[in-house]
Amino acid sequence: MRISVKAPAKINLTLDVLAKRPDGYHEVEMVMTTVDLADRVDMTLREDGEITLDCSASFVPDDIRNHAYKAATLMKAKFQVRQGVHLYIDKQIPVAAGLAGGSSDAAATLRGLNQLWNLGLTRDELAKIGAEIGSDVPFCVYGGTALATGRGEQIAHLGAPAPCWVILAKPPIGVSTPDVYGNLRVAQIDNHPDTKQMLQAIATQDFSLMCQSLGNVLENVTLSLHPQVRQIKDLMIASGADGVLMSGSGPTVFALVQKEAKVHRIYNALRGFVKDVFVVRMLGAQEGEILA
């Protein structure tokens, strides 16, 4: 038996860090939404009980360092499943990009194995398991648009934002999320986003207010470490983007654009500067369907 599950990328419309927690994590407040750039995770039942993984990108780890592998190992142990699984990840989301590709692969694996192994778990139960793998995994289990709080595992679902084009551009570097958080001085943050205003913008589908409300406290840290990120931001703004922000810990930057004519201009300007440029749409509602 074989199942395929889409694993969409996410972008942060806001990312705020409120405090460093005693457990070493940070208390965050983030508005996130999934976009239609997606990996695909194929899962094939193994009767020998083994868990194996292959990926279309050769540099992606195929062991416990991989979030999807970790998800399968956790599910098998937690529910004492006799069978195993072979995972194949068709990688379309750039790695170490601030787009939660690894977390989304893990979430897709949880959803797929729930069906493949006939576990009968709810999305809420899967999200709780996902929190043991990584802070972005619970959001990725649900998809759509949501406010994430706590260390990212507490999810409040939101309606769809105003429809628009999203242009993603990733410079040819990887960014370590622990390194970015390690360089963040919470007491010195002076660019906290207005999360309430963003929630209002989404509730009213106000595109202009959504662009005004974009904010990410990790952006200045990554910009100081990687000047290429600022160059991409500046190029997007100069080319007429309505709103521009770095996603997650970076280095991917996204532009929000309402008029299609602008999309081509911004895309062409970026393609002369970086290789990884994607034009996508927000998925809006909860996503992550099982394909087959």
From Swiss-Prot:
Q: Which reaction does it catalyse?
A: 4-CDP-2-C-methyl-D-erythritol + ATP = 4-CDP-2-C-methyl-D-erythritol 2-phosphate + ADP + H(+)
What's the Enzyme Commission number for this chain? 2.7.1.148
Q: Which GO terms describe its molecular function?
A: 4-(cytidine 5'-diphospho)-2-C-methyl-D-erythritol kinase activity; ATP binding
Which residues participate directly in catalysis? K10, D136
| Binding residues annotated for ATP, in chain numbering | P94, V95, A96, A97, G98, L99, A100, G101, G102, S103, S104
InterPro entries named in the record: GHMP_kinase_C_dom, GHMP_kinase_C_sf, GHMP_kinase_N_dom, IspE, Ribosomal_Su5_D2-typ_SF, Ribsml_uS5_D2-typ_fold_subgr
An example of a Pfam family matching this protein is: GHMP_kinases_N
Where does the chain cross the membrane? none
UniProt keyword annotations, A-Z = ATP-binding, Isoprene biosynthesis, Kinase, Nucleotide-binding, Transferase
Give the intrachain disulfide bonds. Answer: none
- Which terms under GO biological process does the entry name? isopentenyl diphosphate biosynthetic process, methylerythritol 4-phosphate pathway; terpenoid biosynthetic process
**Would you say which domain of life the source belongs to?**
Bacteria
**Pathway, per UniProt?**
Isoprenoid biosynthesis; isopentenyl diphosphate biosynthesis via DXP pathway; isopentenyl diphosphate from 1-deoxy-D-xylulose 5-phosphate: step 3/6
Give the record's family classification: Belongs to the GHMP kinase family. IspE subfamily.
**Function, in words:** Catalyzes the phosphorylation of the position 2 hydroxy group of 4-diphosphocytidyl-2C-methyl-D-erythritol.
NCBIfam families attached to this UniProt entry: ispE (TIGR00154), PRK14608.1 (NF011202)
Q: What is this protein called?
A: 4-diphosphocytidyl-2-C-methyl-D-erythritol kinase
Which gene is the coding source of this polypeptide chain? Answer: ispE
